[in-house]
């Protein structure tokens, strides 16, 4: 089976609001929320990875699509920060090798 270079991972949970730069929460609550979301992303990523012949990408473009129930204008910077535990989970799951700015371009 040939290796694929595109993977769609759907997570039925919003990134944690505790990771927003505007959030004022206790560090333990932030950690708990990040761990929960990261574990959800990790599980979905591993499931998607195991269905195909996936090799971790050194350079990647990550597109994050967040769907909300109500239509309001949202700040992209906040959502980029909120996705931090999800990006870390993609590295842990072996989807991407690195999550720094030299190896990843991200669009939220």
Predicted feature residues:
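Catalytic phosphate/metal-binding cores of nucleic-acid and nucleotide-processing enzymes, i.e., regions
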Residues: 1-108
């Amino acid at each position: 089976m040939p290796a694929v270079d595109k993977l769609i991972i759907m997570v039925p949970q919003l990134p944690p609001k505790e990771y927003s730069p505007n959030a004022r929460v206790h560090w333990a609550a932030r950690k708990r929320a990040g761990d929960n979301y990261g574990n959800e992303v990790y599980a979905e990523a591993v499931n998607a990875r195991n269905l195909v012949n996936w090799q971790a990408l050194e350079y990647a473009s990550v597109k994050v699509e967040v769907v909300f129930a109500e239509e309001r204008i949202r700040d992209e910077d906040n959502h980029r920060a909120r996705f931090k535990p999800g990006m870390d989970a993609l590295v842990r799951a072996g989807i991407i090798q690195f999550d720094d700015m030299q190896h990843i371009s991200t669009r939220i």
